[in-house]
Amino acid sequence: MLTHKTCQARKKMQVSFVIRDAEEKQHRNGVNALQLDPNNGKLYSAGRDAIIRVWNTRTESNEKYIQSMEHHNDWVNDIVLCCNGRNLISASCDTTVKVWNAHKGFCMSTLRTHRDYVQALAYAKDREQVASAGLDKAIFLWDVNTLTALTASNNTVTTSSLTGSKDSIYSLAMNPSGTVIVSGSTENILRIWDPRTCMRSMKLRGHTENVRCLVVSPDGNQVVSGSSDGTIKVWNLGQQRCIQTIHVHKEGVWSLLMSENFQYIISGSRDRNIIVTEIRNPSNKMLVCEEKAPVLSLGYNIDKTGVWATTWNSDIRCWKLPMYDRCILTSGGMDAQWTLGGTEMACIRGGAAIKECTVLNDKRYIITKDSQDKVVVYDVLRVIKKEELGPIEYEKEVMKRNKQVYIPNWFTVDLKTGMPTIVLGQEEVDCFSAWVSIEAGLPECDDPTTEIKINYGKLLLEALLEYWTPPHSIPPNEMEPDVRGNGYFQVPKHTPVIFSEVGGRTVCRLLVRDAAGDSESTLLHETAPQWVTDVVIERNIPKFLKIPFFLQPHPQMTKPERSKKDRLVANEFIQCRKVCEHVLEKVLNTETTPSGGNANNSLQNSQSDANSEGSQLPAEERIELWCNDVVVDPNMDLRTVRHFIWKQSTDLTFQYKAKQNFNFDGK
């Protein structure tokens, strides 16, 4: 017996997985942040599809993809390169901060200090210090050299915290020397700390909405802020006041980039415009470009002649800056004339994000429509893309493929990352509620006359964790074989599987194939909820769901004395032909087989062949079932009849009668 030890015992857990390709070379959703390594021209992009990608900006080829960095399972909100480009720090909506080997692309360690979405990072290059902040109102300071030295045995890290924030923090900035740190929040104010002492030095008021982006001057004397109120403000920290308010956007300002001399601002807005503005003379401005969607992030290209921009869409574009020569953004160039910008210098194409999803009635397939209006069918059970239908009419295809069958919901679909994430749990939707016949597209059993029922949730969990070996501390039972998987199918080995708290933090993320590893096996043993180990390790069978229903003669029956209304209970997936068999054998032959009329009678034992006596015709060709004045298809199961025909909260009621040329004696 597996003794399941878990620190998550009191937490309600869920399991999720992503249906995707083994390698996703394109962003599948918006891109939240950019970082360029000037040493090698590598551009790092933080995606809302939970993936950080690396691009070669020095190549003229359209194929700029180098690699993906995957370990987050929600939006990556911010990234910073540190240690001269050797390492990268990332912040995510999965509430974690991760430390990466930037060159090799693997996650070195995960920091779980935050309790909510981590929205922003700030980096002090001269001190190798990183700050993180998010919706939990907390700001933490990290020593990068300590973070990059963490190992499995040396995994203790200390952090300093900056307290005093009263609302969710959306922006954060530090100067290179690490003498000033500034935060912006939904409190609509800027808070300033000295990170060396963790003491708050001041707060600045002036914005009327959330402060979305911040930049601190290298000397720590000035701060530039962009807000959802549509303004850009320049603050003098020595004077503790706003010295300039710039109105160049019609909607919120979400991204800022400064010239080296801190005299020019490049701003990106929700209004889709990217604009260059001179701080001392805001009327001296020039539109760089109008993007196709709200601008999320900006970053210089390698020679600073252009600016990389990301938006709600998945493309990353580089736009030529409008300037006479590069000195206008470096030395000032007050007398230089603007030249027209807006030329697209390069584009890294992204993929389509799924925007709509419908779960079909069979509760196995889902149909999606993406941002390019392309329709795709996915097989949730096998965790694969089944069919690409192209840009066809979505609603018509859903209607065409939906069958009149009712199977309980056993999973939910999350489209936040732009890819289909399937969620299994035990809360509002029970992942073990879907019992179906083996005919649901799975291999036939050895005996075709045997009716086998399968549980979708059980089969899927067994496939997702097929490579999980129980801990060695469990004494093996030599009398029982080591059973792995579900015996019917396997799922793609590259599938990411995530264990997380319901509505909360991620506890464990791994690929299907990685569950065989010793460390992953131990982690699963510590974190997997009991309802998962019950079916995957203990091989327990989920309980059947039952439906009570009434059975009575149809008014057209020729024997009015048979007016008794029997109440029965059966598994909800029993087909109506079994009810016909019960009527034929247990009700109409009451004189010879006095077993009908029991109020607690179940159909579990009514499995005999209706052809064995009296006629070679099956029961459904001799008995007719009615519900709500509708003849019931004998292939329908009880839950489908209740959902599509009965449509009432009261117990399902059937009426039966003999078909033509058949009497009570079965002749």
Swiss-Prot record:
InterPro entries (alphabetical): G-protein_beta_WD-40_rep, WD40/YVTN_repeat-like_dom_sf, WD40_repeat_CS, WD40_repeat_dom_sf, WD40_rpt, WDR48, WDR48/Bun107
Annotated Pfam families: DUF3337, WD40
WD repeats mapped onto the chain: 26-65, 71-110, 113-152, 164-203, 206-245, 248-287, 290-329, 349-388
CDD domains reported for this sequence: Ubl_WDR48, WD40
Single Gene Ontology MF annotation: ubiquitin binding
Domain of life the protein comes from: Eukaryota
Keyword tags: Repeat, Ubl conjugation pathway, WD repeat
GO annotation terms (biological process): double-strand break repair via homologous recombination
Region of interest called Disordered, as start-end residue ranges on this chain: 591-615
Keyword Isomerase: no
Intrachain disulfide bonds: none
Family according to the record: Belongs to the WD repeat WDR48 family.
Subunit field text: Catalytic component of the Usp12-46 deubiquitylase complex consisting of Usp12-46, Wdr20 and Uaf1; regulatory subunit that, together wtih Wdr20, stabilizes Usp12-46. The Usp12-46 deubiquitylase complex associates with arr/arrow; the interaction leads to deubiquitination and stabilization of arr/arrow.
Function recorded in the entry: Regulatory component of the Usp12-46 deubiquitylase complex. activates deubiquitination by increasing the catalytic turnover without increasing the affinity of deubiquitinating enzymes for the substrate. The complex deubiquitylates the wg/wingless-signaling receptor arr/arrow, which stabilizes the receptor and increases its concentration at the cell surface; this enhances the sensitivity of cells to wg/wingless-signal stimulation.
Protein's recorded name: WD repeat-containing protein 48 homolog
Annotated source species: Drosophila grimshawi (Hawaiian fruit fly)
Biological classification of the source: Eukaryota, Metazoa, Ecdysozoa, Arthropoda, Hexapoda
